[in-house]
């Protein structure tokens, strides 16, 4: 009996279905993944079950489908993940390798931060996002520079300084919570901007 794959994805036992249908790298799986509606359903389910995200992306990489799906993954899965509180997904995308793989720029990270701040009127979540994001915003020779190890101003480029200041302006412009603004002010003072 032929079953509509979209209906399969909508079933509640999605984790088992994913294991059965989407971890075997065959032509049938590729054909399913090229079904746009199915692809969106999978993406939405991967947001709900964040532990599936890594396996889903590996399937896409295996079939050379990642290049065409990067925009979807960043704009849909990642922002939906933050909206639903799946911060593991955010951390997954911000590792050095995955930042390079998805070509995630600081500007994209800021867009995600601003979106999440607007979507989630939640001081704890927004503050936590800031604490995750800021160590990833400054790089030196592709190494992540943490607030504990970064020299004061020498490794921060003019562009990075301008970016940090623009973040502050954008956050002030949407009148975010005082705790968040204070965090930014401390960061700006740290970099002696």
From Swiss-Prot:
It comes from the Eukaryota. This is Putative uncharacterized protein DDB_G0272821. It comes from Dictyostelium discoideum.
């Amino acid at each position: 009996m032929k079953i509509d794959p979209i209906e399969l994805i909508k079933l509640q036992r999605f984790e088992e279905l994913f294991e059965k249908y989407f971890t075997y790298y065959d032509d049938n799986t590729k054909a399913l993944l090229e079904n746009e509606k199915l692809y969106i359903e999978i993406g939405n389910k991967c947001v709900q079950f964040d532990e599936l995200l890594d396996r889903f992306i590996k399937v896409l990489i295996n079939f050379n489908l990642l290049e065409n799906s990067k925009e979807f993954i960043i704009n849909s899965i990642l922002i939906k993940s933050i909206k639903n509180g799946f911060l593991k997904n955010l951390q997954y995308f911000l590792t050095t390798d995955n930042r390079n793989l998805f070509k995630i720029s600081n500007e994209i990270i800021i867009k995600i931060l601003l979106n999440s701040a607007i979507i989630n009127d939640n001081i704890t979540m927004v503050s936590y996002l800031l604490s995750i994001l800021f160590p990833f915003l400054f790089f030196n020779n592709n190494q992540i520079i943490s607030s504990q190890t970064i020299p004061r101003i020498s490794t921060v480029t003019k562009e990075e300084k301008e970016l940090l200041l623009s973040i502050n302006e954008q956050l002030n412009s949407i009148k975010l919570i005082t705790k968040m603004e204070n965090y930014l002010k401390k960061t700006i003072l740290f970099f002696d901007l």
